[in-house]
Amino acid sequence: MQTEPVAPMLEMRCISKRFPGVMANDSVDFTVLPGTVHSLLGENGAGKSTLMKILYGLCRQDSGSIHFEGKEVDISSPSKAISHGIGMIHQHFMLVPTLTVAENVALGLGGRYGISDMRPIKKRLSEVSERYGLKVNHDALIWQLAVGERQRAEILKALYRDVKLLILDEPTAVLTRNEVDDLFVTLRQLTADGKGLILISHKLHEVIALSDEITVLRDGKVSGHTRPKETTRDQLAQLMVGRPVSFTREVASEIGRASCRERV
């Protein structure tokens, strides 16, 4: 018996974006299904960050369209993205250090409760924390938290807003091994609940371990699309750099260095 095909949660169709002297995205197609992790790979300057900035409303595409849950959407700002159910966890966390976790969540809620009454916010935060295993003290000031706890606070802030699609930019870059394991448990729970995840990472072993789909960008274009069971780290590295490689310590180091440079 054949199963019905799953309708995409997100379709970015023929997205192009030019900056002075560089074509950051050149007719890029990118699709995310509900309940899946779709990883986006590429070297420094490949166009990953630009594509995700377009999706999150941080810049506008020159051409192409974005379709979310079957409808074409115009995403002109991060608040627009959030209103559609699209959230983003940045590599450098976007939290106010002198406010508590709960107060950071309350920022930008449009005065539904206001910071003067945190009880409804804390109640729901506790529910979301328990559901996804995101343990963090909601009354702690952000500056008092460890890096892994700050990331959990960022994820809680997005989930509080009922996001359906979450972009994670290099989420394991500053985490310990145990924190990475905990994060992966949370991400799998999110996909089990039907949420779509976009993972930007240069750690190929993590991409293969966590992803359902993998898209590779090179020089602003899609150089390949595959699934973990159909590929290897060597093949992914070749799609990234455009030449045959053997995944040695040298190649891993080169890819790691690229992720730390300024990205387009």
Protein language model regions, located:
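Glycine-rich phosphate-binding loops of nucleotide-dependent enzymes
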Residues: Q2-R263
